[in-house]
């Protein structure tokens, strides 16, 4: 009887672990699908994937050096569909969870700027861009994996030009959005470069 009880308990625990693992796997798949939709200009589709994933695990972060939040991407998706109210609410949650989420701060600033709160919006955009620049400086200083990030300083130079210039409102926000997209793409490019370097003949493995 005792053995039967132990077997039942073990089976239940295994089922619980597997269910949790399956749920985490699905969240990861939805986040990647949502990011892909954003990167290909389909924010409405991104909201479907990212919204579902955020309901399951609102604290999920990308398993990369940048560790971007699912809420950051969902907020960006709402921003790109023109829904400032939802974008602001979600991005505020992202920043409440991580005040150093510079991509979230960038899109939060863009949302405020487009909502006619331009003074505060500009400050938040500047803070987001400066934070991204500092983060890239820090990560590229690492002797092991720093070489894979922004190797030609393309993103950092774009940030410097945007912050140093005095572009018209439309040009400024367009430049800031472009940098946000570049940073997101850099996450994938850097990871792919690191993987290729690790597993090629003579690599780190």
Task: Give the ranges of each region predicted by the language model.
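Terminal, low-structured helical/coil segments at or just beyond the last alpha-helical repeat
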Residues: 135-205
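TPR/TPR-like (Sel1-like) alpha-helical repeat modules
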Residues: 54, 102, 110-137, 163-167
